[in-house]
Amino acid sequence: MSGPVTGGCQCGAVRFSAQALGRASICHCRMCQKAFGGFYGPLVTAHGLAWTRGRPARYASSNLVSRGFCAACGTPLTYEYDGGTELAIGALDDPERAAPVIQVNPADKLSFVDRLHALPWRQPGESPAADAFMAAVENHQHPDHDTPTWPPAKGMHP
């Protein structure tokens, strides 16, 4: 996971670059579940982190950890502790560069997580209403690459 990486929040107000990534993990602790609004927290150690647009707001989720997030759109961005910073894998422009290699805090893992892969997929055509809704969705989030300015001119979303 070496080489420079970039990423940022959903609205584009906060952007970062890291010189390299370290270990990627899935954390099942209850604090990560709440911070990510999901079943677990996907995180990767960042080396040489720099904020290239804006800066995250922070919340002290415990006596040892602060979590960075975009104050404008709420995107979770960091897990910060004495000695290191981990980035939210989903905030990377290319999350495929940070495939998790370990899971931590198994005592808090939700009981159904190991069965998610077996859930059925809704295929195109099975729900015309859902297909129509998805076709009408217009993406307003920041693209997965650095931009010189953001947001773009009114009406010029990606």
Question: What is each residue range found by the language model?
Answer:
Residues M1-G8, A13-P158:
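A short Gly-Trp-Pro
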